[in-house]
């Protein structure tokens, strides 16, 4: 067996496999193991299911260790094929549905693609999500200052502190219209809140980052440049944090947080409603 991998983990679904991945990752994060992940969406027919079973079995025979299989599959005939594999199979949805069925005294009506599929009865939410993504892309990195009043949150920060990925995650995951505005080196001699942002101060949220981490990120982009120097990064971070404090702008240090954690903290601090899709 590959010494760098403790377990092979499959995430299998007749839909996008997002639910299987999210719940499976949450479970596996509780164990001190290194995993090799294999995600297999849209396992919708018996031929595809048999190919997946063969893939699971091949890894078992190669390694001698049962792969872990997290699955979410509606059709019983497809499930049956996966369960015949040499993997240790866990139906992540049924594990929650069964006790709820007993508690609510209702029978579930499972439908493939229901969790992350496009529901004809839910097109307004889908359209709102796409509009949020379009808005966020159009207002990335200060590209456009038009219609900033339509933003639900405006992220501020120095270059490469995480504004763009956080904005896009907010838009794609929660349908939040998130603009972001960069403070660049040329701003630092007299750093003030831009006039275009002052009327929208209630929508502003700042990001900062440890200078050492910022320098490492910038070095990958512009090696041996003033832009990536630790001295420059320390100066920019200090100036921006002083601006946040002076203008009472809420802010967090993004250094030790994932994009998901940063976005969730922003939603909580800014009082924005979460919309799941």
Curated annotation (Swiss-Prot):
Entry-linked Pfam families: Kinase-PPPase
SS bond partners: none
Keyword DNA-binding: no
Catalytic activity reported: [pyruvate, water dikinase] + ADP = [pyruvate, water dikinase]-phosphate + AMP + H(+); [pyruvate, water dikinase]-phosphate + phosphate + H(+) = [pyruvate, water dikinase] + diphosphate
Residues at which ADP binds: 157-164
Presence of the UniProt keyword Kinase in the record: yes
Keywords: Kinase, Nucleotide-binding, Serine/threonine-protein kinase, Transferase
Gene Ontology CC annotations of this record: cytosol
HAMAP family referenced in this protein's UniProt entry, alphabetically: PSRP
Protein name listed in UniProt: Phosphoenolpyruvate synthase regulatory protein
Organism: Escherichia coli (strain K12)
Lineage: Bacteria, Pseudomonadati, Pseudomonadota, Gammaproteobacteria, Enterobacterales
């Amino acid at each position: 067996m590959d010494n760098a991998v403790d377990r092979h983990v499959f995430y299998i679904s007749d839909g996008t496999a997002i639910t299987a991945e999210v719940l499976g990752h949450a479970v596996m994060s509780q164990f001190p193991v290194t995993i090799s992940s294999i995600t297999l969406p849209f396992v919708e027919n018996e031929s595809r299911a048999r190919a997946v079973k063969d893939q699971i079995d091949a890894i078992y025979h190669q390694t001698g260790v049962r792969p872990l299989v997290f699955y979410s599959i509606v059709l019983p005939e497809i499930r049956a094929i996966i369960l015949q594999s040499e993997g240790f199979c866990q139906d992540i949805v049924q594990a929650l549905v069964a006790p709820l069925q007993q508690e609510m005294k209702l029978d579930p009506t499972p439908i493939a693609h229901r969790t992350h599929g496009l529901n004809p009865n839910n097109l307004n939410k889908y359209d709102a999500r796409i509009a949020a993504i379009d808005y966020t892309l159009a207002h990335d990195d200060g590209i456009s200052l038009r219609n900033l009043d339509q933003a639900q949150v405006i992220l501020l920060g120095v270059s490469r502190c995480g504004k763009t990925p956080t904005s896009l995650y907010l838009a794609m995951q929660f349908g939040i219209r998130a603009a972001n505005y960069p403070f660049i080196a040329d701003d630092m001699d007299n750093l003030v809140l831009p006039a275009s942002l002052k009327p929208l101060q209630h929508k502003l949220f700042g990001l900062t980052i440890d200078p050492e981490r910022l320098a490492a990120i910038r070095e990958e982009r512009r090696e041996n440049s003033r832009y990536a120097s630790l001295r420059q990064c320390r100066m920019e971070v200090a100036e921006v944090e002083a601006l946040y404090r002076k203008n009472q702008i809420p802010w967090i240090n993004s250094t030790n947080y994932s994009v998901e954690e940063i976005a969730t903290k922003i939603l909580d601090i800014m009082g924005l409603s979460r919309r799941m899709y």
